[in-house]
Every structure is written in structure tokens, then in C-alpha cells.
């Protein structure tokens, strides 16, 4: 879900002739500097094709190391379920505080899991409430949060977020 979203979002901005960079991380950081055009689109797709889920690098370590490379005021898209990383809130607060428009696209792993297996209703409700609390906290730090349900197409999730 996340790699397809990153490809779609980067393609949108490249078609507008905007510069786009890509950062992926897990156990290590992979940074593709900002550029424009078809060649950049190919580079982004190549990098995304080799991305694997997992790793233990905290988001704040990533944002701290990249802060000097991000132009002030540039929009920053974060695609993350927001689970298991206690540094997410400080990282988003720092990005927002440095003048960046932070957009968090958060695929709901809870709803995805519910689609493929049977989670007891009470467990699902508790996990859903915890997720909503995380999204609200992230929003409170200045980020625009898009709660992306697995049964909803990306374009619809993005369009639905315009009014919020």
C-alpha cells in the first residue's frame, strides 16, 4: 500500500514539474535527492521496487539527519501506520516547527488485518480507539493526517481529506 501511494504522490508532483525527493528507511536510510522529470520518476520507482517493510530506525533520527537537506517550507509526506515508533510525535513537531507542511498518509493496518483475519470485535474496537488517539495526537502537532482505510482507493482518501 505505502509504496504504491509514494509512487502515485511523487508522480503527481513530478507532472507539475516540482522537484521530488524520496526517503525510505528501515535498518538503514536511503535518500534520493530532489530532482524533476522522467528520469527522477524512474529513479523513484526503482527505489520503491526494492523497499522492504521492517527495520528499527526511529523517524526522528531520519528527520534529524535530513533536516539540512529539506528546503524550508517544502511539503513533507510521511507514509506510515504510526505504530511502534515513540519518536513520531517529536519528529512531526520539529518538521512543522521548521515551517514544513507535514502530510501524514496513514494506512490502517488494523483494518487491513481485520479484512484478512478474524479479530475479535472488542479487540478491534480497542485497537481502533488507540489508533484514533495516535492520529489525533499527530494532528495536534500540526500535521494534516489522512486515515487511509484499505478498502478505499488512494485517490478517494486524498480527495476526502481536502475538506478536513
Predicted regions: what they are:
Residues 1-164:
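Exposed, interaction-prone extracellular/peripheral surfaces
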Amino acid at each position: 500500500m505505502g509504496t504504491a501511494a509514494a509512487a502515485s504522490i511523487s508522480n503527481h508532483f513530478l507532472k507539475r514539474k516540482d522537484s521530488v525527493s524520496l526517503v525510505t528507511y528501515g535498518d538503514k536510510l536511503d535518500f534520493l535527492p530532489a530532482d524533476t522529470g522522467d528520469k527522477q520518476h524512474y529513479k523513484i520507482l526503482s527505489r520503491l521496487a526494492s523497499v522492504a517493510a521492517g527495520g528499527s530506525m526511529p523517524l526522528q533520527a531520519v528527520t534529524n539527519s535530513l533536516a539540512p537537506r529539506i528546503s524550508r517550507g517544502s511539503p513533507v509526506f510521511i507514509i506510515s501506520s504510526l505504530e511502534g515508533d515513540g519518536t513520531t510525535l517529536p519528529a512531526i513537531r520539529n518538521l512543522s516547527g521548521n515551517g514544513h507542511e507535514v502530510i501524514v498518509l496513514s494506512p490502517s493496518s488494523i483494518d487491513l488485518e481485520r479484512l484478512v483475519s478474524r479479530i475479535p470485535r472488542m479487540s478491534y474496537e480497542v485497537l481502533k480507539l488507540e489508533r484514533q488517539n495516535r492520529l489525533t495526537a499527530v494532528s495536534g502537532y500540526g500535521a494534516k493526517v489522512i486515515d487511509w482505510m484499505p478498502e478505499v482507493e488512494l485517490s478517494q482518501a486524498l480527495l476526502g481529506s481536502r475538506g478536513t
